[in-house]
């Protein structure tokens, strides 16, 4: 019986070492050499302190900042709670949430008479999407400009500066990283305290 089990046990041990040890170490090593920033989480540092990741949304509130998409990942965009609400488009709970977010967005951005961009009132699949559409950023630009004492054209120019194009020219939509644009606002146009 041991003679018949031996090949299976050897194959099991070999595949465990190959796929459980060698392959992960090789991929991690290659990632560290070829893409060190991305392999370490695309962390953003200021003054030697990590303040966030370009891949994870952060909660920004107040008139002087661009706001990210709503998150279903807890109140603070908690990565360990990542996930969608799992509410279908006809679920009354989702309809009520979106209606409340539309009202709040219109109150926070007076003077915007067009429709609220969908990504400002709907959560992403992960609940942690760090990007908003260019339209969502432009929609908030007047509020941010007023709160910071900027000309609207400067705020809109900043939106265009921080707009990333479609991936490979065809995938997705142009998007704005909320953390990156808000950090630029604080560096270039600091708030008077």
From Swiss-Prot:
InterPro entries the UniProt entry points to: KdpC (IPR003820)
A Pfam family that the UniProt record links to this protein:
KdpC
Q: What is this protein called?
A: Potassium-transporting ATPase KdpC subunit
Q: What is its main location?
A: membrane
What's its membrane topology? Single-pass membrane protein
Q: Which GO terms describe its molecular function?
A: ATP binding; P-type potassium transmembrane transporter activity
- Species source reads Rhodospirillum rubrum (strain ATCC 11170 / ATH 1.1.1 / DSM 467 / LMG 4362 / NCIMB 8255 / S1)
Membrane-crossing residues?
7-27
Its family remark reads: Belongs to the KdpC family.
Q: Where is the protein found, in the record's own terms?
A: Cell inner membrane
Protein keywords? ATP-binding, Cell inner membrane, Cell membrane, Ion transport, Membrane, Nucleotide-binding, Potassium, Potassium transport, Transmembrane, Transmembrane helix, Transport
Top-rank lineage group of the source organism: Bacteria
Instruction: Quote the subunit structure annotation.
Output: The system is composed of three essential subunits: KdpA, KdpB and KdpC.
Q: Which GO terms describe its cellular component?
A: plasma membrane
Q: Which residues form a coiled coil?
A: none
The answer to whether keyword ATP-binding applies is yes
Give the function comment from the record.
Answer: Part of the high-affinity ATP-driven potassium transport (or Kdp) system, which catalyzes the hydrolysis of ATP coupled with the electrogenic transport of potassium into the cytoplasm. This subunit acts as a catalytic chaperone that increases the ATP-binding affinity of the ATP-hydrolyzing subunit KdpB by the formation of a transient KdpB/KdpC/ATP ternary complex.
């Amino acid at each position: 019986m041991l003679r018949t089990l031996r090949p299976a046990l050897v194959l099991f041990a070999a595949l465990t070492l190959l796929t459980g040890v060698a392959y992960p170490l090789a991929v991690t090593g290659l990632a560290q050499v070829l893409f060190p920033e991305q392999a370490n989480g695309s962390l953003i540092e200021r003054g030697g302190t990590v303040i966030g990741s370009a891949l994870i949304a952060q909660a920004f509130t107040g008139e002087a900042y661009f706001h990210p998409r709503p998150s279903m990942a807890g109140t603070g965009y908690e990565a360990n709670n990542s996930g969608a609400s799992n509410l279908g488009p006809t679920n009354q709970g989702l309809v009520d949430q979106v209606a409340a977010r539309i009202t709040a967005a219109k109150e926070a951005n007076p003077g915007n008479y067009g429709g609220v961009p969908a990504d400002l009132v709907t959560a992403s699949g992960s609940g942690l999407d760090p990007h908003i559409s260019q339209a969502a950023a432009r929609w908030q630009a007047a509020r941010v400009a007023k709160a910071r004492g900027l000309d609207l054209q400067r705020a809109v120019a900043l939106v265009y500066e921080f707009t990333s194009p479609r991936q490979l020219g065809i995938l997705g939509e142009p998007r704005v990283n909320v953390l990156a644009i808000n950090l630029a606002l604080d560096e270039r146009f600091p708030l008077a305290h």
